[in-house]
């Protein structure tokens, strides 16, 4: 069974995925490994080969989509990790992060100011959450702000096992983002 671990870059997906007791497939590694259509000239990043990714995930996973998470053992789950992973599953857990903290993380990664702003706007506008809700039958949302990776991993396992439900719509950064000027230098 597959479940997406998705969210704006910098929200903690890779760090938390490394702590989960399930099989992890890193979508970004697959894109960097050749499942791409080349570099997008405007954005300077690799453009994912979505059809190629779907085929490769099916080959690597061989299990199918997650139809029912009630009391599922986390070890029976394949987590597809990455900010476009929700395109390949019926269920997604979307990580959210306060844009003020997100800005610090993205700058520490050496992202250009344009890329930082693009990702802050995406987070403030719920871009990944909205996509996940459109593409997935089930979506849970975790605000990772102020939580340790272990605490977030515990929440993810709880969601996977059906012990907790974290429905979307609980997190909104838009008003704070607009009022505070986080996107400005």
Segments predicted by a language model, with ranges:
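Walker A (P-loop) ATP-phosphate-binding motif of ABC ATPase nucleotide-binding domains
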Residues: 2
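A glycine- and Lys/Arg-enriched "phosphate-lid" helix/loop adjacent to the NTP-binding pocket
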Residues: 37-39, 97-140
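Conserved lysine of the Walker
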Residues: 13
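ATP-dependent small-molecule kinase phosphotransfer cores
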Residues: 23-87, 172-178, 182-184
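NTP-dependent small-molecule kinase module
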Residues: 133-185
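Hydrophobic positions on the alpha1 helix immediately C-terminal to the Walker A/P-loop
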Residues: 16
């Amino acid at each position: 069974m597959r479940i997406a671990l998705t969210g704006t870059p910098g929200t903690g997906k890779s760090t938390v995925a490394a702590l989960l007791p399930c099989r992890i497939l890193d979508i970004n590694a697959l894109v960097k490994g050749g499942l791409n259509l080349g570099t997008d000239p405007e954005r300077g990043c690799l453009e994912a080969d979505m059809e190629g990714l779907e085929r490769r995930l099916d080959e690597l996973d061989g299990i199918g989509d997650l139809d029912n998470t009630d009391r599922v053992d986390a070890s029976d789950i394949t987590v597809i990790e990455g900010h476009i992973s929700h395109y390949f599953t019926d269920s997604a857990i979307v990580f959210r992060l306060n844009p003020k903290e997100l800005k610090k993380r993205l700058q520490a990664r050496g992202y250009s100011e344009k890329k930082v702003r693009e990702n802050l706007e995406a987070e403030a506008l719920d871009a990944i959450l909205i996509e996940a809700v459109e593409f997935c039958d089930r979506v849970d949302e975790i605000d990772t702000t102020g939580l340790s990776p272990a605490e977030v991993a515990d929440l993810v396992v709880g969601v996977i096992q059906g012990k907790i439900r974290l429905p979307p719509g609980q997190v909104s950064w838009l008003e704070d983002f607009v009022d505070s000027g986080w996107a400005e230098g």
